[in-house]
Each structure stands twice: as C-alpha cells, then as structure tokens.
Amino acid sequence: MITRMSQLFLRTLRDDPADAEVPSHKLLIRAGYIRPVAPGLYSWLPLGLRVLRRIEHIVREEMNAIGGQEILFPALLPRAPYEATNRWTEYGDSVFRLQDRRGNDYLLGPTHEELFTLTVKGEYSSYKDFPVLLYQIQNKYRDEARPRAGILRVREFVMKDSYSFDIDDAGLKAAYHAHREAYQRIFARLQVRYVIVSAVSGAMGGSASEEFLAESPVGEDTFVRCLESGYAANVEAVITARPDPQPVEGLPEAVVHDTGDTPTIATLVDWANRAGLGRAVTAADTLKNVLLKVRQPGGDWELLAIGLPGDREVDDKRLGAALEPAEYVLLDDADFARYPFLVKGYIGPKALKDNGVRYLVDPRVVDGTSWITGADEPGRHVVGLVAGRDFTADGTIEAAEVRDGDPSPDGAGPLVSARGIEVAHIFQLGRKYTDAFTADVLGEDGKPVRLTMGSYGLGVSRMVAVIAEQHHDELGLRWPASVAPFDVHLVIANKDAQARAGATALADDLDRLGVEVLLDDRQASPGVKFKDAELLGVPWIVVVGRGWADGVVELRDRFAGQTRELATGPSLAADIAAALRG
C-alpha cells in the first residue's frame, strides 16, 4: 500500500505542547499521532491508529497461539454483577457511574471479571467443556484523579483482558504460565525492555500476581531487584527481611524522660545525644507512631496506629496496598482534639492499648528490640521500651518505604530500585469470582466442581507510549519495524520531474513487493521533509535527492542511525526490501 503525504490527514508541530511533560507525550502530539480532547481523553489520528492496530495484531496472534478465543463485551455495564462481588463499592470514585432514564445504575467498565464469569457459567455445565480461555481487546474507563503523561495515564484506554477457566488449580497454573510466556513473546516482538516483578492483587483479588514493568525514568511504579539473585518486586509487594527476635531478659527497664519540645524525630534524636544515655542515638533507634482513620467499604471510620522505625517514612503505595480495599486518611488537628489521649508528637504504645486503638508495627519491630518513643504526655518520651516485654502490637504491616541497600527478601544481597511503567498484570484469581456467582460445573465423578479462574491484562494503547518512551532520540520517534505505521518513508527531495517520476515508480515497485510506503510527495522544501521524516519515526527512510542524476538513492536506518547509498535500477526495490528484512 502507498500513502501519499499530500493526501494524508496529518499536521506536524515544531514545538512541544505546553502541558506535555514526558517525551512520548511531546512526540506523539508533535508528530500528529494523537490529539487531546479533554483531560485524560485523546483522539487517535491516522498514524497513531496504524501503530495501535499493529500492536493489537501482535497481541491477537500471541493470544490465539495459546488457545485464546476473542469475544467482545459492552463497555456499559449494569450494577448488579459488581454488587455481587462488592466491587461496586470497592472501586469508590475510580469508576464512571451513570443512570439510564429509568434510574437504573450502570458503570463504564474498568475490567470485566464479572461478565466473563457469568457468561461462562451460562454457556457451559460440564468438566468436559474445560479449559476455556477467552479474551477481548476493548476500551476501558477509569476516573483518574490526575490524568498525566499523555496516553500513559488516561481515563479511556485500550486494554487486552483475558480470562482462563479451569476445573482445578493445576489447570489454572498452566494457563497462568502460558500467559506469562505469551506476554514475553509479545514484548520481544514489540522490542520493549521490561522486568517481571512480584505484585499485589488489590481489588482484583486472588493469590499469585505478577506485573510486567517497562523500565523507564518516567514510570510511576517503583520496583526493586536483587542483582545477585534476580529477585524483583513492585515496592507494594516487597516483604521486609524480618530480624530474629532477641531475648528480653537482662535488658534495662524503660525510663520516662522529660525531653522538652521534641515533637519530631530530628528533635528527639538531638535531645537523646545530649542526654548522656551512654550511646550514640540515630533515628533508627526511635519508634514513631503514625495515626490514621481507616474505613472498610460500607463501614465506619476507625482509628489505626502504625509503628515504624523513626528513620523510615510511610510509603503511601505500600500502605494503600496493605489496607486494600479500605480507604484511609491521616488524622488532622480536629481529630487530635477529638481524642485527647493522642498527644501529637509524643504518642506511645501504652495510650493506644489503653484506649483500644488497633496497633500494627513494621516487621523490624520484633520482640527484644529496644526503642525510644512517646510517653503519651507533652514533652516526655520513654527510653528503652522493649517490644514483647513492655508492649505488644496487634500485628505487622508492610507500610514503610523500601530503600536501596535494604536486604533482599531471599537473603541473596541488597536491593536496588528503579522506575517502570506497568504494561501488563497477571493474576491467579482462584475462586473469588466463581464463588460470588456459584459458577459450578458437573465434575467427572458427577459432583459439582467450582471453576477456578485467572485474569490477564495488557495495556494496548499504553504500549504505544511505552515504545515511544523507549525508542526515540533528539530528532523524534524511532518505531521498531513490527509496529511502525509504514515500512518505508520515501522522501522526494528533488524537484526534477524525472526524479519525482522515478520515486513514484519506486513506490509502486515496493508496493508490489508487499512493502508499505509513506510517499512524501508534498510541495515542501527538503529540510521540512527531512525533519518530518525524522519526527515521524518510520524505521527506514529512502531519499530520492540530488544523487538520482548520478544513479543513487540514500537508504537511512532511522533505528540504527546509519545511512548508505543504493544504486538505482531494476533491482532497487528488491535491494530495499532485502535491507528491511535484514
């Protein structure tokens, strides 16, 4: 196929959009691939849609290769199935809700576990019908509070979601690993650099869960890995290396001290190192207690205290994952006034226990560890408060920040952190959704068998931005051949009639060889055409310029940055096609 730029619906921009922060956002708009409609909403113009469709094609091929069958559900979904799984409430403000003229509730689908489960339940009733693997590629909707970074975080996006249904856990694990391998093949074909990390399931539920993160400095997800062992996990899923408990016998008794105006960890440490305690004190020797209000879906607000070493901050993502699906907020001044036993800056475990406040601590707070913490009175702290002797928590919580240098959970070495963009997430859901809908089939022994389920998502439209992030330079985009909107960008950089005719004939020859050609036949200067060719990012650029009279054209490899000359003649199109094949 030949597409003439003189007829293509395209307008490139020379300057970055004022609100664009990341390279993919800037380049996709400047190159005319997408256009903004409203916050978190984008139109796909011809070039962008071609890239999107090529990614979809690769995804379909790999899903079909593992036995997937494509279906399509509506995006507008009724309330009832989501009530059955409690996700109508759990999703909170993150979904778009609406009513029809009769007052019936609907939402715009953020994901489709409920509908897939009900459909399979309605169609199949025997173990002989399984395993089943269904998928769809469809627009999804989430009411992002802060859409950003172009099409990386939006309110409408294209996603491939697939679901496996099996009669036993062995079948579920097989489907899970088949998807894991299929995703690896997809990302290899897309030339996306990624890492597979352990993850949390969140509102999706289930047990085993892994994310595929595309490494990128603009990524919103922080992950850690151990270079010695290959361990990798999203920070929300990192399990803190727990120290061994220590004996409490022989430890000094806890002593309350007047510490003056010391409501912060920094001021407390400064006091401790001037108080003649007989040792140097750091923030890691202190125990700070953070107070929250927590509310389960449909429930009331309750107090929750979290104790962690004073040298650690609470990681909001880890805290959110640990409390899922509850919502939470930090206590404000009005809350402290309502609970006078909570002395801001001087809170200790004793007042929490005496007043029935649930108290969870960091896994490093093990029995036998000694701490400096609040004494529940203004200007007073207790030194030498020993866990397991002087106070006991109600449990542990993974809410503290993870740092470079922390020991890996597998004990193989230190952790190092990096940033990534989530491009896929796979779950072994188990029976959460089939339990909700009593999705049973008749087993081989004639007894009912509850189906077990897997869920596997892949961000198709996000992949366009991810590839743009990983494959660009200072001149513009550099699409891998597998997803590029065209195979060859043929630039006519010579006004000579014979050169133009030769370029057109070359485009026809390439078309006959199955090469998709973008022919720049515009009445524009060579400089403008070259800038656009570099910006658009088609992997191969053929220049019919001044060398045409000498019997040569230029072949530029946009991906590798190399240029060579090819002789004109009957074999020119075949030579170009051979170069494309490598």
From Swiss-Prot:
GO terms for cellular component: cytosol. One of its GO terms (biological process) is prolyl-tRNA aminoacylation. Keywords: Aminoacyl-tRNA synthetase, ATP-binding, Cytoplasm, Ligase, Nucleotide-binding, Protein biosynthesis. It comes from the Bacteria. CDD domains: ProRS_anticodon_short, ProRS_core_prok. It is an enzyme of class 6 (ligase). Its EC number is 6.1.1.15. The keyword Aminoacyl-tRNA synthetase applies. It is found in: Cytoplasm. GO terms for molecular function: aminoacyl-tRNA deacylase activity; ATP binding; proline-tRNA ligase activity. It catalyses: tRNA(Pro) + L-proline + ATP = L-prolyl-tRNA(Pro) + AMP + diphosphate. Consists of three domains: the N-terminal catalytic domain, the editing domain and the C-terminal anticodon-binding domain. Belongs to the class-II aminoacyl-tRNA synthetase family. ProS type 1 subfamily. HAMAP family: Pro_tRNA_synth_type1. Homodimer. Catalyzes the attachment of proline to tRNA(Pro) in a two-step reaction: proline is first activated by ATP to form Pro-AMP and then transferred to the acceptor end of tRNA(Pro). As ProRS can inadvertently accommodate and process non-cognate amino acids such as alanine and cysteine, to avoid such errors it has two additional distinct editing activities against alanine. One activity is designated as 'pretransfer' editing and involves the tRNA(Pro)-independent hydrolysis of activated Ala-AMP. This is Proline--tRNA ligase. It comes from Mycolicibacterium paratuberculosis (strain ATCC BAA-968 / K-10) (Mycobacterium paratuberculosis).
